[in-house]
Amino acid sequence: MEFMVNCYNKSDHKLSWEGKMMKTIRKTAIVMLLFVYFLTYGVLPQVLAAGKDTPMIVVAHRAGAKVAPENTLAALEQAIRDGAPIAEIDVQQLSDGTLIVMHDSNFKRTAGEDVCVWDTEADVLSTLEVGSTFSAAYRGEQIPTLEEMLACARGRITLMIELKYTGQEDALEESVLTLLQDYDMVDECIIGSMNKGILQKMKELEPGISTVFAFLILRR
């Protein structure tokens, strides 16, 4: 969550040193008052109260990006070996409808190819390699499909599937739910998103599915 305070001075004349100092003090005071208000009456107390009696759960972010290439089968296998109860993965849709496990909307950072996910078809995946950017030991690691991740995780670890919204999707929610049903994993997965519409749609399609709304509290 971000706060931005804009202070305007309509006067065109130059301020004295004392005037500049007072202006700075006033700005600081306003920011501090807002900060105190946030701590006292804002979201933070509600968040802390909600989590007071809730046990901590370890989630392998991007399937375990600290120990293996992010969002890969290698990372998921390591998360399982390490005993993580939940692995979070990011899912996007290719132009042909294939669901892949990928965080960025472009392959540049992880695979070195400056191509957008929505401009790519499934047959291109075999040409993309995402392991060597993490470590030479993982050279050859490829981008998995959601189906491959489900097959690997079934009965072994809960998947928190974050659905990425780019505006290029076609029946994303239906496609994901169909796969979960095919693998009988509706109860083994949690659907997450920063887009409330996606979560609402998933609940309409499958009222019993677990969902989580992802949001930023603080970003630098």
State where each predicted segment sits.
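Initiator methionine at the very start of the polypeptide chain
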Residues: 1, 21-22
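N-terminal amphipathic/hydrophobic targeting modules at extreme N-termini
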Residues: 3-5, 13-14
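Phosphate-group recognition and catalysis centered on beta-loop-alpha active-site segments
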Residues: 6-8, 17, 23-31, 35-220
